[in-house]
Amino acid sequence: MSSRALTELLCGKGAHADPMACVEDLPADLAARHVEGFPHSIGHLVFHMNYWMDYDLRRIRGEMPAYPEHNAESFPRNSFSIDAQKWDHLKKQFADLLGDAAALANSSPKEMQRHIESTHAGHTKLAGTIEAVLWQLVTHNSYHVGQIAMMRRMLGAWPPRGGGDSW
């Protein structure tokens, strides 16, 4: 697929929900609320997506971030509470990281094929180019943005102000 398609998916064009629209108008109390049947709140999912986007973008920049021993490390601790200030910070970080990823998606074809150093044995089993890492990032975010859309529906907060299908 093209870098245009990658950018469109990062920014929620076409049939894909806009990740920022799914969180930007949600108040902190709803972002912090746990929905029955879901192990994490919306705020926790945004924290988790931020964690992995930051991790991948740092790898792309040539840093060697430590890979967590367990996925639980990519979620906030149980004692983490989300107030309005923390929620605003999480949303700003989310927007900034999405913007950084979208800027990278517009790199030259040669740059998109640049190999990224592995920081974990699992990376050696996957394609390790900038393009491949960005596609993994989009797919990961898509999964969690879908969860957020479902949770918002269950909380009676769908569609978001920025728009979203409501079949």
Describe the residue ranges of each PLM region.
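Active-site rim elements
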Residues: 2-10, 84-91
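Acidic/histidine-rich alpha-helical segments that form the ligand environment
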Residues: 77-117, 131-139
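Short, contiguous alpha-helical
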Residues: 7-16, 20-23, 29-76, 118-167
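Acidic/proline-rich low-complexity IDRs
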Residues: 5-8, 25, 96, 103
